[in-house]
């Protein structure tokens, strides 16, 4: 895109939130190498025929390629080794939840920048019999946390919410994965953790992605105990070398034998607290012993006859996507993909949904959330009427009107019985707070930055949030994680998706769904298509470089939109039902792969 027309502003850190997607379908016990799909959907009335996409001439991902196809089980992930672990669980007779849990623990070994034991996340489940569930294992603020703990004497933020021991919330990942397995898994937990233990104790081959990631974050890791593990000679493990993690292997063995007990009340908890004391952190044995994941009622919504199953608060993802898509539905018929009219509608709906997200959402145990209003069709119709057809509206004016009226990884699982799981987990930043639990082998998160440290001041993603998300002891911080399951108008599973990238998770996830439903794109095209992002403040539209035609840009500028350039808008991993099985893929913006059988 011509830089005369695109004004580049400081981009917010895309790398902070990472996503992994895993789709698993149980079937016959023989394994096939996953191959590019040539399957067509013509002739199957339950699966609408896809329409070839047309992207701008300068766009870096050409339309028309195929995602990976597998008839029985498929795992699509930012990390191929973790994807192989998920497929392995299914071959051993496990269900979708077994595969999701095994993949999650494997990611803690092979994808340490985001996969984790020291973070938290969300899981959305739909069983084949129609039951749905949502597990919230988001981190919580330590009991010693205070509302203004990151505000210095000069009234400015002191930076302690993003790096170092005071940035860490009480981790929920281990409790969450063990609880999900307890309720829905069918294999012994020791078998589910066995692949991750093997990867940690025997090691795996370092690829360029891990090598570069560690090198870029040496400043974050180097001040704590992880330096000796990840930079033993002053440099990260070389590409092609075998990386062994004996401390982490020991921790995983303890979890395999005791579940979450040792992590929250035993020797692993002792190691976490000792690390906190050495570095001046806040997490105590009482914090860990009190932590509990929470089962919640999934958020159910509809869009043009399709059903969405998503995560309710403390995640903001499901609520914001629901409101945004309800507004678009009320706004009227869909304009062509990539047109100024379509981008204007998308940006305007997103702007309004983010205004509500940033001011009204938080931990439901601490704040009263008008959830039924925000997700209602009636409210969306009223909000849609505030969108002009030919000009942009200022966020400051809209905020008054509406008041009156990470690093992350995502994985998605589908098994042959029709059970589906969408999971997103995070450390927030790459390698979290940088604090490494010596003797236990894992990083702790820096999720405290997802709270409103000071109303009116942006966090690392540029989000300006309100008092509903302020810090309080034991409170869950707001998140943009958006694990989502989509059903077709007949109630059949269609899509399992989620993304990485801070608040841009919401944009990527919603636009993949819209591409599939409104524009009838194939999975590859829906994932590859150019994306846009509007989070209310800054009051502007981010567009991916090369993803917009000059004439469209000029029209948006005439309408009063401030448009700026982004290298990328999140990174998703998704699975879609097609004739004869499933397609799955990691985002072309990422470096993972798909494994299936």
Predicted regions and their residues:
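Noncatalytic scaffold domains of N-terminal-nucleophile
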Residues: 35-84, 88, 96-97, 101-258, ...
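Short, small/polar residue-rich loop motifs at catalytic or cofactor-binding pockets
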Residues: 295, 405-408, 430, 479-481
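Extended C-terminal subregions enriched in glycine
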Residues: 475, 509-510, 518-567
